[in-house]
Amino acid sequence: MSHKRESGRQVTENLRTGPVPRTKLILCVEDNKAYLRLRKTVLEREGYSVLTATTGAEALKVFREEPVSLVLSDHMLRGTTGVALAHQLKTIKPHVPFVLYSGTVPDIMGDADCFISKDETVASFLSIIKSLIKRHGE
């Protein structure tokens, strides 16, 4: 299956968004616990339900067991990368959007649907998440 990779800005420029139902479940994967709490808080304030994982193995377990609408993952994780995790998760549920984020742009995005810089504004970050969820009809 071929996926078109887009930057966060391209996603929001290519898709008008309206309100997203407030029951969407996002899996946030980050090994930095302070950053994980920050992302979780921002998403929950927007009405999303958020599950968290600090390792690729933990994310894989949650992804298999829960009806996740979108995965948001750091690129550099202990023991794996976001690119490797995207490949594993897309093998299980290819329709679930996978957003890779990092402080630096990775050379390879693999199966990730979109890349977001950690420097992205909160408003832009949330707009990208909303756009991807709406686009994938979840």
Feature map (PLM): residue ranges:
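Non-catalytic signal-transmission and effector/linker regions of two-component phosphorelay proteins
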Residues: 1-25, 121-138
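Acidic catalytic/metal-coordinating carboxylates
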Residues: 55, 81-84
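Acidic, metal-coordinating helix/loop segments flanking the phosphotransfer/catalytic sites
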Residues: 52-70
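Conserved acidic carboxylate
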Residues: 30
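Two-component/phosphorelay signaling modules centered on CheY-like receiver
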Residues: 33-51
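The feature encodes the CheY-like receiver
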Residues: 78
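Active-site residues of response regulator receiver
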Residues: 74
